[in-house]
């Protein structure tokens, strides 16, 4: 990955005084904040500004593990990918491969090609390898429940990446640990960026995929945090399933622009890809790439999102996953499992990438993670 910097973010405690309300029409929910709250939400604005400043920091020290077992030799890891066309899944796979070379292990990748049958077949191929450990790369283990049970019966530890909504160990499904950022923190900092950048005065469109519980929860949390600021108005909640984003987003954005006009000043989306598809419609409407609506993706932060941000092309910010770093963490967690130790418990802090702090990079990872894991493994 091209960037190895990081930022820590303060966890902001807040009270939501009122919720957004509205009516549903087709795929969109029109909504606005209600209730008597202090104009401009000065207290919430101050919290948001502090959180965003911390999340945009690129020089914070490594906050991950510094102690653990030496490298356990002679292991083979199978990486079962939901689909290698997903930039997040493939980015983590590259991190696993890189870390495995350092620790002295072999890695095989099995591509599920994005279908339930493909995932089950890939998992079955991984089991046939009789690996030391298996990575659940970006899918719910329930999609391959039979294979996961066989792995457990064979004593093969499973580690997930985005396999469950929460980070850490899981008993149902049975995972040694699950590597992901906390959805609550990603959602809150995305909303805080809008509140802080707009100084508490924004008209927001929120893009989600309500068919995915994890995505819906993320957008619900973003909506809840935005509602804490009386002068931030949720203009529309757009429910566009991710598989349909490439065919529906342009028409939806064109309709939004016609209906909302200059009231629409900010957007948030549960995945950066919505802004890739929104760009042509915004361009056709005469919007400048670095102008309103200012868009933030609460998604993986894939290279195409970084390209849009660096080029100031209809996306101003993203909350990226540290993909390579998470690949290294997965290898470290396996090493702990093989050594009979518990999971590290580490969860990467959220970070906000903008054109001002990206340095032209196409990814984000914490500063010093490679050195930290090498030291732990004595490699």
Give the location of each predicted region.
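Hydrophobic alpha-helical
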Residues: 136-153, 222, 241-308
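Secretory targeting and sorting signals
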Residues: 1-28, 96
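An alpha-beta-alpha
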Residues: 77, 81, 86, 96-98, ...
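Solvent-exposed loop/turn segments at secondary-structure junctions
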Residues: 83-87, 113-115, 140-143, 164-168, ...
């Amino acid at each position: 990955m091209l960037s190895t910097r990081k930022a820590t973010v303060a966890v902001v405690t807040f009270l939501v005084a009122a919720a957004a309300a509205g009516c549903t029409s087709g795929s969109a929910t029109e909504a606005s904040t209600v209730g008597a709250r202090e104009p401009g939400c000065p207290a919430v604005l101050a919290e948001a500004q502090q959180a965003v400043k911390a999340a945009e920091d690129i020089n914070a020290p490594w906050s991950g593990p510094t102690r653990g077992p030496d490298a356990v030799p002679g292991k083979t890891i199978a990486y079962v990918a939901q689909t290698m066309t997903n930039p997040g899944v493939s980015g983590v796979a590259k991190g696993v491969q890189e870390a495995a070379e350092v620790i002295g292990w072999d890695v095989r990748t099995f591509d599920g090609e994005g279908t339930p049958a493909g995932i089950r077949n890939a998992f079955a191929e991984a089991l046939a390898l009789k690996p030391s450990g298996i990575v659940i790369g970006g899918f719910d283990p329930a999609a391959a429940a039979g294979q996961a049970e066989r792995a457990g019966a064979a004593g093969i530890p499973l580690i997930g990446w985005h396999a469950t909504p929460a980070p850490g160990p899981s008993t149902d499904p049975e995972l040694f640990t699950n590597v992901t950022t906390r959805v609550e923190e990603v959602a809150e900092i995305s909303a805080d960026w809008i509140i802080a950048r707009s100084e508490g005065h924004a008209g927001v469109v929120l893009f989600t995929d309500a068919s995915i519980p994890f995505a819906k929860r993320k957008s619900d949390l973003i909506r809840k945090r935005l509602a804490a600021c009386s002068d931030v108005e949720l203009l529309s909640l757009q429910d566009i399933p991710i598989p349909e984003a490439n065919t529906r987003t342009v028409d939806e954005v064109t309709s939004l622009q016609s209906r909302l006009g200059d009231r629409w000043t900010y957007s948030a989306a549960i995945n950066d890809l919505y802004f890739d598809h929104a760009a042509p419609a915004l361009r056709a409407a005469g919007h400048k790439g670095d102008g309103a609506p200012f868009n933030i993706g609460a998604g993986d932060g894939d290279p195409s999102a970084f390209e849009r941000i660096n080029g100031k092309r209809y996306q101003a910010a993203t909350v990226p996953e540290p993909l390579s770093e998470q690949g290294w963490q997965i290898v470290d967690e396996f090493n702990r499992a093989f050594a009979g130790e518990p999971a590290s418990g580490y969860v990467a802090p959220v970070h906000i990438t903008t054109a001002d702090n990206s340095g032209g990079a196409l990814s984000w990872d914490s500063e010093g993670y490679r050195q930290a894991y090498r030291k732990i493994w004595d490699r």
